[in-house]
């Protein structure tokens, strides 16, 4: 390990919260507990801001794979702070294959992506087709984050629906995407449920998440409850 990366690891251990480590480890069954230091997200984000743009950060970004969960999250937060689109995209694509849990996958989104929605669709399609669990999940997350408002097109619903997998963390994101689409684009999303165009698990899970959401009107929730399919 490069000395710069060793220094950053020591900084992370200095921020360790053992009680938080125990609690958070239980939420991530795919992450070995011994690889979790126990650093809270606000502290990681503060450290990322301190390191951003430094030579130390550049060395750290090249030090893949990392040994600890928090090193991966710090890596993600450093990518978020990159202001150049091409560089942020390149670092994201280099990092995605090393993500091994939902929490790291869902924790970051480079701010510069919001200014390049048209260009971002190309890598999103590539991520959806990758076959890698968390790369696929990340692609769906980007569609959910940036393309359910003014940039929405009905075909994006098809992109997510066309992802076929037995992986839990992919299918949970598919359901989350459709639940969010019901809140933001109900006219386009609702027919996917009324016409039963999704697989049974995603259909029912999307309804469950939508009914639990505060963004869905009560009338819509009543309709959705009636669309549940009993297996």
Give each language-model segment a name:
Residues 1-231:
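Alpha-helical scaffold domains
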């Amino acid at each position: 390990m490069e000395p710069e990366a060793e220094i950053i690891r020591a900084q992370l251990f200095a921020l360790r919260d053992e009680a938080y480590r125990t609690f958070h480890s239980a939420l991530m069954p795919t992450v070995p507990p011994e690889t979790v230091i126990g650093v809270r997200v606000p502290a990681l984000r503060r450290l990322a801001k301190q390191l951003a743009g430094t030579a130390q950060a550049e060395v750290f970004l090249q030090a893949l794979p990392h040994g600890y969960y928090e090193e991966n999250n710090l890596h993600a937060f450093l990518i978020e702070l990159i202001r150049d689109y091409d560089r942020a995209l390149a670092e994201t694509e280099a990092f995605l294959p090393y993500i091994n849990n939902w929490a790291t996958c869902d924790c970051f989104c480079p701010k510069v992506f919001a200014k390049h929605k048209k260009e971002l669709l190309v890598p999103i399609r590539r991520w959806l087709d990758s076959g890698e669990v968390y790369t696929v999940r990340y692609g769906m997350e980007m569609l959910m984050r940036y393309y359910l408002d003014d940039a929405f097109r009905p075909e994006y619903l098809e992109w997510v629906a066309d992802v076929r997998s037995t992986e839990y963390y992919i299918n949970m994101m598919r359901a989350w995407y459709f639940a969010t689409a019901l809140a933001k684009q109900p006219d386009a999303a609702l027919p996917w449920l009324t016409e039963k165009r999704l697989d049974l698990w995603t259909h029912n899970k999307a309804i469950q998440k939508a009914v639990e959401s505060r963004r869905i009107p009560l009338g819509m929730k009543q309709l959705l409850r009636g669309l549940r399919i009993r297996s």
